[in-house]
Amino acid sequence: MKTPRLPIAIQQAVMRRLRENLAQANLKLDRHYPEPKLVYTQRGTSAGTAWLESYEIRLNPVLLLENIDTFIAEVVPHELAHLLVWKHFGRKAPHGKEWKWMMESVLGVPARRTHQFALQSVRRNTFPYHCQCQQNQLTVRRHNRVVRGEAVYRCVHCGEPLVAG
């Protein structure tokens, strides 16, 4: 799937939110953390990722275009919080107490670990699997692990192994 071009107004709104959150954090933490690099190269079902060593935030342009306001309000501060925790505390658990504190007390945003965006447009092919109680869909990666005998996946409801078909 080709990555969509993001309108400049959306890119500006993302950058504005990033700068507002960063300024707020620098003020509350009495620091002068630099602005991270912002790129729109995240693919798949992840809304964004924070790359600590390169001090970079990668955002998913497809999910951004489909969920502009919520994405800017939640995903941008979420990823920035990861970088700020790394700068302020060093390497910590990705969604640990330091990250939660950074989100809620410093940035003033609810600390949610996952997004609730519709994923139909970014989800790849899936393979049907079933157990005793329901039908399931496995991603290509998980399906290939089953085929190679590297993994067995179980139903979260009944605990039975998932079987292809």
From Swiss-Prot:
KW Zinc (keyword) present: yes
Domain SprT-like: 22-163
Annotated residues for binding of Zn(2+): H78, H82
InterPro entries membership: SprT-like_domain, Uncharacterised_SprT
This protein's UniProt keywords: Cytoplasm, Metal-binding, Zinc
Subcellular localization, as worded in the UniProt entry: Cytoplasm
Recorded GO MF terms: zinc ion binding
Gene Ontology CC, one term: cytoplasm
Cofactor binding description: Binds 1 zinc ion.
Pfam families found in the cross-reference section: SprT-like
GO biological process: response to stress
Cofactor(s) in the UniProt record: Zn(2+)
Active site as annotated: E79
Database matches in NCBIfam families: PRK04860.1
Family stated for the protein in its record: Belongs to the SprT family.
UniProt xrefs under PANTHER family: PROTEIN SPRT
The protein's name in its UniProt record: Protein SprT
Organism: Salmonella paratyphi C (strain RKS4594)
Gene name linked to the record: sprT
